[in-house]
A protein has these predicted regions:
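Short acidic, S/G/P-rich loop/turn micro-motifs used as interaction or catalytic elements
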Residues: 11-15, 36-38, 77-78, 115-122, ...
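Active-site-proximal specificity loops/subdomain of glycosyltransferases
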Residues: 40-106
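Conserved catalytic core of nucleotide-sugar-dependent glycosyltransferases
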Residues: 101, 120-179
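Short, acidic, metal-binding catalytic loop of nucleotide-sugar glycosyltransferases
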Residues: 19-29, 35-38, 45-53
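Short loop/turn segments at strand-loop or loop-helix junctions that form parts
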Residues: 7, 31-36, 70-76, 138-141
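Short beta-strand-to-loop acidic/aromatic patch adjacent to the donor-nucleotide binding site
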Residues: 101-117
Length: 179
């Protein structure tokens, strides 16, 4: 495998297929399908859109060129208020175990969101970084749906303002967070 990407997914069939189709073919994709308590049925359309079904003990997933690991945490819901963060951690823990067991010969775990629109030339390669660097945040831009441009601009300014404020204060945590 050329790498691994973890994608937490909840009730996002429309945008997820576009994201998956832009991932490199040699990439292991870990989909952690999750739902909060009481919303377990919300992923039915997602499973249908991906055409997730067992075949000889292995799941086939439409729209993904490379190997895929589907972790279904929607039938056993995640605890309240831990959804996307815990789903991302579950996927990263699985990838880390595969790396530690030398099943997955890569050095980086990438993560994105199911509702992200990736650029057409998107590639997840091991970045060239200085020793001691353990995490990177890729440049991002939020594209607002019609009528929400001002709200999205304020949201993105708030994200950057938070990080810049931490940097100005000399904090070692001056980086964007992910859910």
């Amino acid at each position: 495998s050329e790498g691994v990407v973890v994608i937490p997914v909840y009730d996002e069939p429309a945008t997820l297929t576009e994201t998956l189709e832009r991932l490199p073919a040699g990439l292991l994709t870990v989909l952690v399908i999750n739902a909060p308590p009481g919303a377990e049925g919300r992923n039915a359309a997602l499973f249908q859109a991906l055409d997730v079904r067992p075949a000889d003990g292995v799941f086939n997933v439409r729209h993904i060129a490379g190997p895929v690991l589907v972790v279904n945490r929607s039938t056993t819901p995640l605890p309240p208020r831990q959804g996307v963060g815990l789903a991302r951690k579950i996927g990263a823990d699985i990838a880390l175990r595969l790396m530690a067991d030398h099943v997955l010969p890569v050095t980086w775990i990438h993560s994105t969101d199911a509702d992200v629109t990736l650029p057409p030339d998107y590639a997840l390669a091991a970045p060239a970084v200085d020793d001691g660097v353990a995490a990177l945040v890729y440049p991002f831009e939020h594209v607002a749906p019609n009528g929400l441009g001002d709200a999205m601009a304020r949201y993105e300014i708030a994200l950057h303002h938070y990080v810049l404020g931490l940097a100005l204060a000399g904090s070692g945590y001056a980086h964007h967070t992910i859910g």
